[in-house]
Each structure stands twice: as structure tokens, then as C-alpha cells.
């Protein structure tokens, strides 16, 4: 069954009504050529999954109704936070993809003293957005119920402070 994340969680009232998806915003639903009666999963990113059944397909819209809502059973019992030094080139993208697939709940890129990669604030924000998209895609592919957070790159001292504040059991 196909798995997607909602941009924002829906209220119980919104879930009771038929959901309409526009081609402009949900192109990937149309690419799959879903037909009436087929089902897919919408996750809210906070641990709830909604199984939806397609009720109507038009040229520029798709309508579905929620058949069942449940808690996601695919998450780890603990939170796994990855503090990752910035590697060369695009290796960080692969690292984030695999970390999300393995169950990481949060990923913090760290600028180390000997890292060859240096990012200013503008580049760091763009890089964080790109990495968040990769994390979302990996979470959809591995059918996660929670959308992992990818922080903007931090300095080593800030990452250590973040680790000290973590709830370690």
C-alpha cells in the first residue's frame, strides 16, 4: 500500500469528511494512477496513520475517504538521535536516507574542526531544507509513522550541548 505524509495533521472532523487532493499539490498520487476502490495510507508525521480509499478520480482531483485511523506500529521504542559530522560532497544525503530507514527520529549535521565542508547561514538553511526533503522521502518509502526532524548544521560545541540535554535512559 502506498504511504504519504500530510503537510499538517487533520482534525477528527476533517477526517470524517471526504478528502480532496488536487493534481497540483499531490502529483505523486496521480502518477500512481490510483483507481476507485484502491487504498493508500496518509500519515500525520506524529504517529497516526489513516487508511484512505479512493472514491472518485477526476482529471485534476482525487477524492478519498478515511476507512481506518490507527497508531503507527513501525516506530522504535526509543528515540534515536544521530549527530553526524559533515562529510564531503553529497554523502550526507545517503547517510540521512539510511538513518531514517533504520529508525532515527532526529538527525543533527555537525560542522567539525577538520570538516572540509563549511556552510554559511544561508547555505546551511538551504541544505537543511534539502535534507528534510530526503528524510521525508525515506520515511515514506520505509512506511514510517513519524516524520524525522533534520536540524540545520550545528557547530560541534552546540551539538555537544544538545546531547547533554537529551533524555538518556
List the predicted regions and their residue ranges:
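RNA substrate-binding interface of SAM-dependent RNA methyltransferases
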Residues: 73-169
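N-terminal positively charged helical leader segments and presequences
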Residues: 1-71, 122
Amino acid at each position: 500500500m502506498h504511504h504519504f505524509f500530510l503537510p499538517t495533521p487533520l482534525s477528527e472532523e476533517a477526517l470524517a469528511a471526504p478528502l480532496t487532493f488536487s493534481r497540483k499539490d499531490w502529483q505523486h498520487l496521480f502518477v500512481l494512477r490510483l483507481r476507485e476502490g484502491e487504498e493508500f495510507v496518509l500519515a500525520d508525521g506524529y504517529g497516526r496513520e489513516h487508511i484512505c480509499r479512493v472514491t472518485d478520480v477526476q482529471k485534476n482531483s482525487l477524492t478519498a475517504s478515511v476507512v481506518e485511523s490507527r497508531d503507527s506500529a513501525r516506530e522504535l521504542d526509543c528515540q534515536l538521535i544521530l549527530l553526524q559530522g559533515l562529510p564531503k560532497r553529497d554523502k550526507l544525503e545517503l547517510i540521512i536516507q539510511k538513518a531514517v530507514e533504520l529508525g532515527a527520529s532526529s538527525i543533527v549535521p555537525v560542522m567539525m574542526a577538520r570538516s572540509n565542508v563549511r556552510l554559511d547561514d544561508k547555505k546551511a538553511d538551504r541544505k537543511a531544507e534539502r535534507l528534510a526533503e530526503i528524510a521525508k522521502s525515506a520515511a515514506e518509502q520505509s512506511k514510517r509513522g513519524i516524520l524525522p526532524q533534520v536540524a540545520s548544521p550545528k557547530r560541534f560545541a552546540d551539538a555537544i550541548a544538545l546531547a547533554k540535554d537529551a533524555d538518556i535512559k
